[in-house]
């Protein structure tokens, strides 16, 4: 005969409840639409399109205009494997690199190379005042993947439009 302790008996007693309890799952877009923020979501998607177009056009001025002017947080965080490779090349390599959107806009404006970022698996959350956007990316230079990872933007809605306040991304350059 099988003997069960009190913990096992409690777990068995709760099993039917656990198996029948269902939590509704909604996508970010469904949640936002239900909360009345569909127009904000569309405006944020427009910021992403403008970002992409500015990079393709080497337009650092337009790119800079998408960011909150006083915001400077731009973090590039190497993945563990990328950091290990970087340390082999330079023992003083940094895992977290701090920069700002102005430096990126300057690079976009001055490089003769062709930049083309690809974004996928977009997840967006907003309350109509602040927002976070999370996506996977591949950053192509002259048609070749130069970097990949995940990226998050924190955005704020000012009196006139949505602006990126900070950018944080993981970085896995090709080997």
Show the residue positions of the predicted features.
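Bacterial N-terminal signal peptides that target proteins for export
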Residues: 1-11
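Short beta-strand edge/turn micro-motifs at domain boundaries
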Residues: 24, 132, 146-175
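A mature extracytoplasmic/lumenal domain signature
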Residues: 67-69, 77-79, 135-139, 168
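A short gly/proline-enriched turn/hairpin at secondary-structure junctions
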Residues: 73-94
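Surface-exposed, charged secondary-structure patches
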Residues: 87-144
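Bacterial N-terminal signal peptides
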Residues: 9-20
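Extracytoplasmic
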Residues: 58, 68, 117-119, 128, ...
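Short, low-complexity N-terminal intrinsically disordered segments enriched in polar/charged residues
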Residues: 22-69
């Amino acid at each position: 005969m099988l003997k069960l302790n009190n913990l096992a008996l409690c777990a068995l007693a709760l099993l039917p409840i656990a198996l029948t309890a269902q939590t509704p799952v909604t996508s970010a877009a469904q949640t936002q639409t239900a909360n009345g923020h569909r127009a904000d979501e569309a405006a944020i998607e427009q910021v992403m399109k403008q970002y992409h177009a500015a990079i393709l056009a080497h337009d650092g001025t337009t790119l800079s205009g998408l960011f909150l002017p006083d915001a400077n947080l731009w973090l590039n965080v190497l993945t563990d494997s990328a950091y290990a490779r970087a340390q082999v090349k330079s023992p003083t390599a940094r895992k977290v690199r701090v920069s700002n959107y102005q430096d990126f806009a300057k690079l976009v404006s001055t490089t003769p190379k062709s930049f083309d970022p690809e974004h996928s698996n977009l997840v967006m959350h907003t309350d109509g005042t602040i927002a976070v956007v999370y996506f996977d990316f591949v950053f192509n230079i002259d048609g070749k993947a130069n970097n990949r990872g995940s990226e998050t933007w924190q955005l704020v809605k000012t009196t006139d439009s949505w602006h990126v306040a900070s950018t944080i991304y993981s970085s896995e350059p090709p080997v």
